[in-house]
């Protein structure tokens, strides 16, 4: 494949990727004392949509399990001292009602 054709395909791929991402609506977390902490820790690895999408399914115990899984399995940058405040925020704002 010549250089011009390769460049053309790269340009097309870039345009598709940009347009696919452009349609996303940013998620604004519920206000709360720990909202900034949750946003800064969770958004390192995934969209904040994950929190909203799972909110109707997760109890306090389940949220804690999710946070610990993200730490241990996925390597999330959450310290042990941050687990309780994050779980408190998630349970209060996004836990099973």
Which positions does each model-derived feature cover?
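Electrostatic cytochrome c docking/interface patches
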Residues: 18-37, 72-75
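Bacterial N-terminal signal peptides
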Residues: 9-19
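Bacterial N-terminal signal peptides that target proteins for export
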Residues: 1-10
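C-terminal capping alpha-helices of c-type cytochrome domains
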Residues: 77-97
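Extracytoplasmic/secreted proteins, especially bacterial periplasmic and envelope-associated proteins
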Residues: 33, 37, 62-65, 69, ...
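Alpha-helix N-cap/helix-initiation sites
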Residues: 35, 56, 79-83
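The canonical Cys-X-X-Cys-His
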Residues: 39-49, 86, 90
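N-terminal, post-signal-peptide region of Sec/Tat-exported proteins
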Residues: 48-78
